[in-house]
A protein has these predicted regions:
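N-terminal secretory signal peptides that target proteins for export/translocation
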Residues: 1-2
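Eukaryotic scaffold repeat domains enriched in small/polar residues
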Residues: 7-10, 14-231
Length: 231
């Protein structure tokens, strides 16, 4: 009888831990301090950064940030001062995108079905509901709790959803500063590459390498010519 009660206690603890784990992102978002912004100022912000929804997928060579919930995967990209967020379903099928102008860093997260877009320089968060009908802008108080939330959930390159671990990887580009893959590891430790932009990054690295090599050759040639002239 005693063993039966112990087993029930273990089962109860297991389910409680699962509930806490699955709601971690949502509850942590509630801990940060935000203030609503008026309709006029919201409109001005959305207009000034040219925030808009797009229906064509734009492919990039590296992933800047990502977010996961039960039904969606969001991938964030930098294209100079233009930022893009591609939204995919849980089978990695493209659905739609958002794009906007921003000169600083940005990050993304989900609060349940709501997409949260953080503009770090401006200290604001833009939230878009699942139906894509409501866009809300709030100012965020910059404090220790906010920084901890950013580090743990928004900036993190490793995230957990429904006992599955997701992380950004450089793939086989060991010395690359860019993340080219989003990898999923399930509860049985089976690994699956969901998105892979490594081939696109090879082209970029080749172009950059060629430019650097050309610059070094020109520099060495100038040094050699200068030494020869002095002789």
């Amino acid at each position: 009888m005693k063993n039966k009660y112990i087993l029930l206690i273990y089962i109860f603890i297991y389910f409680v831990c699962n509930i806490i784990n699955s709601s971690a992102n949502a509850s942590s978002y509630k801990l940060i301090s935000t203030s609503p912004i008026g309709i006029e100022e919201t409109t001005n912000i959305i207009t000034s950064i040219d925030f808009r929804k797009e229906n064509s997928e734009k492919i990039f060579s590296s992933i800047s940030c990502f977010a996961i919930n039960d039904e969606s995967i969001a991938l964030g990209y930098n294209d100079g001062d233009r930022k893009y967020i591609n939204i995919y379903d849980d089978y990695c099928n493209y659905e739609y995108s958002y794009s906007f102008d921003n000169y600083g860093s940005f990050g993304i997260d989900f609060q349940n079905d709501t997409l949260l877009v953080y503009l770090l320089r401006e200290n604001i968060v833009i939230s878009i509901n699942k139906d894509k009908t409501t866009i809300e802008v709030k100012s965020v108080e910059e404090n220790d709790e906010y920084q901890e939330y950013l580090d743990k959930f928004v900036y993190s390159k490793v995230k957990v959803c429904n006992d599955n671990k997701y992380y950004l990887s450089t793939g086989d580009l060991l010395f690359s500063p860019s993340y080219t893959q989003l990898v999923k590891v399930d509860e049985n430790n089976n690994k699956e590459i969901l998105f892979d932009f490594t081939k696109d990054n090879y082209i970029n690295l080749f172009v950059i390498g060629t430019i650097v090599l050309l610059f070094v050759c020109i520099l060495l040639l100038l040094i050699y010519s200068n030494i020869k002239r002095k002789k």
